[in-house]
Amino acid sequence: MNRRKQIKGCLVDGPLALDNAVSKEAAEHKGIVSDVAGDCDVILTPDINTGNILYKSINFLGGGVSAAVIMGAKVPVVLTSRSDSEKSKLMSIVLAAAMD
């Protein structure tokens, strides 16, 4: 969608290893030149299992708040975990509504 100019004002790059996506220093150390490296707003994963590992790591190890939505169906699918906070569940609903 980005290549077709359907997403305006958006920088897309990848694949990037997680450290390069979230750490400009790691990307520079590895010689990766990217406007996105170290400053990403969205991390896409190749499948639900990888996404689940990343999602729970951010929440439980990093103390973050995440939103989870599955794309590719006719409408976005909200996917939350029973252990998610109320805020995470709300952010998932908001993200899905914004994507529809």
Predicted regions and their residues:
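Active-site rim loops that border cofactor/substrate pockets in soluble metabolic enzymes
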Residues: 1-41
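C-terminal functional extensions of proteins
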Residues: 54-57, 64-100
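Short, ordered loop/turn segments at secondary-structure junctions
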Residues: 17, 48, 82-84
